[in-house]
Amino acid sequence: MLHHPGTGQLRALKGTTTVGIVFRDFVVLAADRRATAGYFVAHKRTKKIIKITDYMAMTTAGLVADAQMLAEWLANHTHYYEIVNKRRMSIHAAAQYLSIILHSAKFYPYIVQLLLGGYDTQPRLYNIDWFGSVTEEKYVATGSGSPTAIGVIEDQYSPNLSMEEAVELAKRAVASSIRRDTFTGNGVDVVVIGKDFYREYSFELKDILKTK
């Protein structure tokens, strides 16, 4: 959100829907593909889930350039950490790294809302806002379609869902926003991260709209 000059009101800068959900043995991230500039559909196949490592990924909402730069910095930092320390960086440490960058730029902020999900000793999910605030979550949704998506997740969430059921829940949550939110659309991408795997799924709009 940004201050709208001359009105004293807040307005949404960008539109999207991203979700993150933690299950017993894995974490699921999902996002739509539509990129907008105001009410104009700027791109129909935008990748909003960025792979950081084989055990970590980040969803993005906000300004594309800011999100891409932060993802590149994080990927480079985690790679350097692994070379120096001969072990993986924890998801919490990666979230704190992003938090430091965002907080240090709070007077000239990066316009982003990030979800960082991955697996270290267990599946983890962090919600990071543009001022650097970090919260660990079991499930969360961001973007203009988040009010619709979070309702679907809260209604059907269980930590013990199978992977197939978990992917279906994430897809259904974003699909609900596609139906209701002008700024969300054009398909859904889903990533599942577990102890020894990183899996990607893509769903086309025509198939998503069949989802109840």
Swiss-Prot record:
Recorded GO CC terms: cytoplasm; proteasome core complex, beta-subunit complex
Activity regulation details: The formation of the proteasomal ATPase PAN-20S proteasome complex, via the docking of the C-termini of PAN into the intersubunit pockets in the alpha-rings, triggers opening of the gate for substrate entry. Interconversion between the open-gate and close-gate conformations leads to a dynamic regulation of the 20S proteasome proteolysis activity.
Catalytic activity: Cleavage of peptide bonds with very broad specificity
Primary site of residence: cytoplasm
EC class: hydrolase
Superkingdom, taxonomy of origin: Archaea
EC number annotated for this UniProt entry: 3.4.25.1
Gene3D superfamilies given in the database record: Glutamine Phosphoribosylpyrophosphate, subunit 1, domain 1 (3.60.20.10)
CDD domains assigned to the protein according to its UniProt record, in alphabetical order: proteasome_beta_archeal
Annotated propeptide span(s): 1-15
InterPro entries, sorted: Ntn_hydrolases_N, Pept_T1A_Psome_bsu_arc, Pept_T1A_subB, Proteasome_bsu_CS, Proteasome_sua/b, Proteasome_suB-type
Pfam families: Proteasome
Catalytic residues in the record: T16
Statement: the UniProt record of this protein carries the keyword Cytoplasm: yes
GO molecular function, one term: threonine-type endopeptidase activity
Keyword tags: Autocatalytic cleavage, Cytoplasm, Hydrolase, Protease, Proteasome, Threonine protease, Zymogen
BP GO terms, sorted: proteasomal protein catabolic process
Location(s) in or outside the cell: Cytoplasm
Subunit description: The 20S proteasome core is composed of 14 alpha and 14 beta subunits that assemble into four stacked heptameric rings, resulting in a barrel-shaped structure. The two inner rings, each composed of seven catalytic beta subunits, are sandwiched by two outer rings, each composed of seven alpha subunits. The catalytic chamber with the active sites is on the inside of the barrel. Has a gated structure, the ends of the cylinder being occluded by the N-termini of the alpha-subunits. Is capped at one or both ends by the proteasome regulatory ATPase, PAN.
Protein family membership: Belongs to the peptidase T1B family.
Annotated NCBIfam families: arc_protsome_B
Protein task: Component of the proteasome core, a large protease complex with broad specificity involved in protein degradation.
Protein name listed in UniProt: Proteasome subunit beta 2
Lineage: Archaea, Thermoproteota, Thermoprotei, Desulfurococcales, Pyrodictiaceae
